[in-house]
Swiss-Prot record:
Residues 2-221 form the Glutamine amidotransferase type-2 domain. GO terms for biological process: carbohydrate metabolic process; fructose 6-phosphate metabolic process; protein N-linked glycosylation; UDP-N-acetylglucosamine metabolic process. PROSITE patterns: GATASE_TYPE_2 (PS51278), SIS (PS51464). GO terms for molecular function: carbohydrate derivative binding; glutamine-fructose-6-phosphate transaminase (isomerizing) activity. Its main location: cytoplasm. It is an enzyme of class 2 (transferase). One of its GO terms (cellular component) is cytosol. Coiled coil: none annotated. It is found in: Cytoplasm. Homodimer. This is Glutamine--fructose-6-phosphate aminotransferase [isomerizing]. PANTHER family: GLUCOSAMINE--FRUCTOSE-6-PHOSPHATE AMINOTRANSFERASE, ISOMERIZING, GLUTAMINE--FRUCTOSE-6-PHOSPHATE TRANSAMINASE (ISOMERIZING).
Amino acid sequence: MCGIVGAVAQRDITPILIEGLKRLEYRGYDSCGVALYMDGHLRRTRSTKRVAELSEQVAEDKLGGFTGIAHTRWATHGIPATYNAHPHFSAQGKDEPRIALVHNGIIENHEELRQELQGVGYVFESQTDTEVIAHLVNHLYAGDLFEAVQQAVRRLQGAYAIAVFCRDEPHRVVGARQGSPLVVGLGQNENFLASDALALAGTTDQIIYLEDGDVVDLQLARVWIVDQAGKQVERKAHTVQVHTGAAELGPYRHFMQKEIFEQPRAVGDTLQDIESITPELFGDGAYKVFKEIDSLLILACGTSYYAGLTAKYWIESIARIPVAVEIASEYRYRDSVPNPNALVVTISQSGETADTLAALKHARSLGMQHTLTVCNVATSAMVRECELAYITRAGVEIGVASTKAFTTQLTALFLLTLALAQTRGRLTEEQEAEHLKALRHLPAAIGAVLALEPQIMAWADRFASKENALFLGRGMHYPIALEGALKLKEISYIHAEAYPAGELKHGPLALVTEHMPVVTIAPKDALLEKLKSNMQEVRARGGELYVFADADSKIANAEGMHVIRMPEYYGALSPIVHTIPLQLLSYHTACVRGTDVDKPRNLAKSVTVE
């Protein structure tokens, strides 16, 4: 979602701030801005356009300085407008602005604080909760910005990551985090803040990941961190190699297309040359944990939730362990019955998804002790919070609509299935060898499906004029149908729904007409004949079927039946393979419709607020 960059240096940091914002554009935003200390004054430029336009405006305004902050905003409180864009200034009365501040998150008690600050003379120029923090810091300021921020955050309820600097202390930037990510970048006589280490790629590779409750004081030659209790703490610096090429398109039209075609590499890297199935793939002590548990509780949001639904089919059928899958944002508010013997599994691309983190903490508060995360970021809060972890190696995903993160999550969850089965004595050596062979061939199988792109592009031309679509799947392919429908609605803005094919007669069939494309996933599995009957129900009502069928499924093109043949049936891993054509269909449909594929309206990449 929102992005933060800040710096204190002995050189002009304007290019660093702007470049950092460009690297954070993938998170989604509707406005942006930068503020700097210049010649004894606070100066800023804000825009509701793209960062490229902001950069041009900054050059026109001749902004430059050695201390500053920058921000990309995804609107929560207040409409997307320049006056709501960050950074926000604070001054009392007619005084010159003294405080500049940017903020990610949601302050739940902002109305109460706003009224209090208005009562002592502060005038608000925006609708945001962020301006409340700026005025609060200014109100508490008595010559020491670090102390003022510590006092201010004690008054805040909700989630936040903030960066702030003061006109009266020009060589200092202060940051704080609670429930929203913030990192420190270390330099030589210069230091940096960002909401994502990617923003600092090419500037520094020495990164400190702040913990919840931390407040950090950045000066030229010093970084000082205190925890929630105000006690000075040391946080380990990590050497982080972020490849700037991840933020470059190369020969591709969009990042989503690039990331779709990176999936053979991403899945191969996630498998990391695994020679055998062992619980220790998920961390030290995993064998003991896997022996103790009697069930799994999977917590996730969005696309990651669909990965969890797929894993439920695998784990219950192969490892024979009961699995519950919960939408994280619902689970934490439901009066559920906890099972202390369950393994809580969280799934998150970023490892910072606010709802999933909150659900994880809620599960632990109910006495559920064993936790595992499947995550793409090794240094994320999710990994730090969990007992066990499997790090996918998808690489940085820029497009808002998840592609390679999803397939690598599925790959990791299948490995988890096999490790659980082995621990329970339900995986023979022959079965292990067979599954490992299939996994090693998976990148090539994905590559073969990517070769179907020209055929899928022809379908996209037909889909582009539609306003509704239906996706059907059965068994372990039903979650893949859900994911396909989500992708289409996310980036093409076509309303799409997914159903188990067996549920057609229980309502969705009423929607089927010649104007409703029906996308069907038709692998050659035990449910194929049942699925064929469901497809005939659609044809009988004049519906147009678009079928991804395995080569030997004996489903042929006919009137009202359009078929693309998948290269091969891939057994238990078929859901991963069948994901790929649905991604391509959504992508090319969106291209024909002319939408902003990488930055769809109203959506953000990393959802770090509840």
